[in-house]
């Protein structure tokens, strides 16, 4: 199957086995989600995604207090992957991330490390063209597209797409970009994958609460790793592995969880002792 993405100045062809439009999306992950697509392991999928505001922000007058916050962070899907079941991992390789032409960033009241210096609320519109993000006439920088939300159905209950956890979700990891593979534990049959929250660029830390929030098109490949369940999502790049840990309110505990997952990976996959893993991560690992 071939699908096409129309861009200014031409048309980009997506060679994919399947396609899902952006209006097929969810606002929360749960075992009760009805899949919109069923695919085999190894399939490629072209997904359209909304920006995190679901099209509500078009001008700098569209500030956060004017938005319907129930319509934030939609995730395209869910996708049922045949053969995926608890005890496995689902690997999602990001082959392409093509943002649209306009995105937005915000200052949100009572949010972020510089809120005491900035006037809130505020919105800035960014234009994206030829791989460059333009903030204004004086400021531009290279686009580094990434996906904030990549997740599967959790073991129990319902988790909003705004949150992150062992199921993935709103990880906002800027390494979840083209060329990376995100490995996630499977908790429900079929995994029930959903993806969204594209950014044309996002700083590590996303200190105002937003990146360049933008819609666009994504090409992914899904693979089931039988009997190799991770405890937390792991992002694999060409030269590194990035582990994740999440808590509600304790940064040190989140760091501990991410470190434990990294050490476990070294012990199980490379034969490290826990002592060697501890020392290696201290001398060659980064916490972010």
Label every model-predicted segment.
Residues 3-15:
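Bacterial Sec-dependent signal peptides at the C-terminal "C-region" and cleavage site
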Residues 17-67:
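N-terminal, Lys/Arg-enriched amphipathic/low-complexity engagement segments
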Residues 21-30, 68-76, 159-167:
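Short, structured beta-strand/loop micro-motifs enriched in basic residues and often containing a Trp
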Residues 47, 89-92, 184:
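A generic structural signal for residues embedded in beta-strands
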Residues 52-63, 97-107, 190-200:
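Short, Lys/Arg- and Gly-enriched loop/turn segments at beta-strand edges
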Residues 96-178:
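Intrinsically disordered, low-complexity linker/loop segments enriched in Gly/Pro
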Residues 143-252, 263:
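Conserved mixed alpha/beta catalytic, RNA-binding, or beta-rich assembly cores of soluble enzyme
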């Amino acid at each position: 199957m071939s699908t096409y993405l129309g861009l200014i100045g031409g048309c980009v062809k997506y060679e994919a086995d399947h396609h899902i439009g952006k209006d097929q999306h969810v606002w929360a992950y749960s075992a009760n989600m009805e899949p919109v697509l069923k695919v085999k392991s190894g399939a490629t999928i072209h997904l359209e995604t909304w920006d995190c505001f679901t099209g509500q922000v078009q001008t700098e007058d569209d500030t956060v207090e004017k938005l319907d916050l129930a319509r934030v962070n939609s995730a395209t899907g869910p996708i049922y992957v045949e053969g995926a079941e608890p005890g496995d991992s689902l690997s999602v390789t990001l082959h392409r991330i093509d943002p649209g032409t306009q995105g937005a960033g915000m200052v949100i009241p009572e949010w972020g490390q510089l809120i005491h210096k900035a006037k809130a609320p505020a919105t800035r519109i960014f234009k994206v063209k030829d791989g460059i993000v333009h903030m204004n006439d004086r400021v531009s920088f290279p686009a580094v597209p990434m996906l904030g939300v990549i997740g599967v159905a959790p073991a129990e209950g319902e988790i909003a797409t705004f949150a992150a956890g062992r199921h993935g979700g709103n990880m906002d990891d800027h390494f979840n970009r083209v060329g990376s593979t995100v490995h996630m534990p499977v908790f429900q049959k079929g995994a029930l994958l959903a993806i969204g929250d594209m950014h044309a660029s996002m700083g590590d830390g996303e200190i105002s609460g937003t990146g360049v929030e933008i819609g666009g098109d994504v090409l992914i490949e899904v693979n089931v790793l039988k009997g190799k369940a991770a405890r937390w999502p792991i992002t694999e790049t060409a030269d590194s592995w990035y582990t994740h840990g999440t808590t509600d309110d304790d940064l040190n505990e989140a760091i501990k969880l991410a470190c434990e997952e990294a050490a476990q990976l070294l012990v199980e996959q490379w034969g490290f002792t826990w002592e060697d893993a501890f020392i290696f991560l201290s001398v060659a690992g980064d916490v972010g």
